[in-house]
Amino acid sequence: MPDYTREMQHGGRVAGVDEVGRGPLAGPVVAAAVMFDSGVPRRLVTQLDDSKKLTEAARLRAYAALHAARGVHIAVAAASVSEIARLNILRAAFLAMRRAVARLPHQPDMVLVDGNAAPDFGCPAQCVVGGDGESLSIAAASIVAKVVRDRLMARLSCRWPGYGWERNAGYGTAEHRAALCRAGTTPHHREAFGLVRQLTLGLVPAAAPGMAPGLVPAVLEDVS
């Protein structure tokens, strides 16, 4: 379970940052930054964990609790499909992270980033491999980013039905791959990804295993 040890070791304002959406075939990559004023409220500690380990219901409860708690600063940002195509997915994820941190009310003294690489935030940063299972700030960010992106993809699915985004969030499930073979791409598909091109050209079957690694706003106030 994550704890607040790293944050206390650094002292000052420490933000946790995580992103969601590097692997999908459609939609933006979304990043969140979460910073606690004076530690994590006790009622939140047991609700926070790596978003991938939580059920959807548990994620939604934790998301609501984070927004309801005092002394919790949350910022969300994204990099669009067009930015992913122009920059590549890693650089686009870094762009979303920088945007999220820049939207916090105060510049952090330290940024804890899930993973083994981090962008330049204009302040010190530390990479934490498996950080969403180690740091409560990163765990909180992983939950926020996941909920916001899932909601965005569900909204997009209403305008572009048939791809199952409300269920698969743009990932390359069999349902999504079959829809790409059948109906082709939408403006929200990552056409720069090889698998998307191969599916739309019929070069790979929809049931093939594996998954290759714009038109949404970079700031997602309306879905956060």
From Swiss-Prot:
Its cofactor is Mn(2+); Mg(2+). The keyword Transferase does not apply. It catalyses: Endonucleolytic cleavage to 5'-phosphomonoester. It comes from the Bacteria. PROSITE patterns: RNASE_H_2. Pfam families: RNase_HII. GO terms for biological process: DNA replication, removal of RNA primer; mismatch repair. Keywords: Cytoplasm, Endonuclease, Hydrolase, Manganese, Metal-binding, Nuclease. InterPro entries: RNase_HII, RNase_HII/HIII, RNase_HII/HIII_dom, RNaseH-like_sf, RNaseH_sf. It is found in: Cytoplasm. Residues 12-213 form the RNase H type-2 domain. Its EC number is 3.1.26.4. Manganese or magnesium. Binds 1 divalent metal ion per monomer in the absence of substrate. May bind a second metal ion after substrate binding. The keyword Hydrolase applies. A divalent metal cation binds at D18, E19, D114. One of its GO terms (cellular component) is ribonuclease H2 complex. One of its GO terms (molecular function) is RNA-DNA hybrid ribonuclease activity. Endonuclease that specifically degrades the RNA of RNA-DNA hybrids. PANTHER family: RIBONUCLEASE H2 SUBUNIT A, RIBONUCLEASE HII. Belongs to the RNase HII family. This is Ribonuclease HII. It comes from Gluconacetobacter diazotrophicus (strain ATCC 49037 / DSM 5601 / CCUG 37298 / CIP 103539 / LMG 7603 / PAl5). The gene is rnhB.
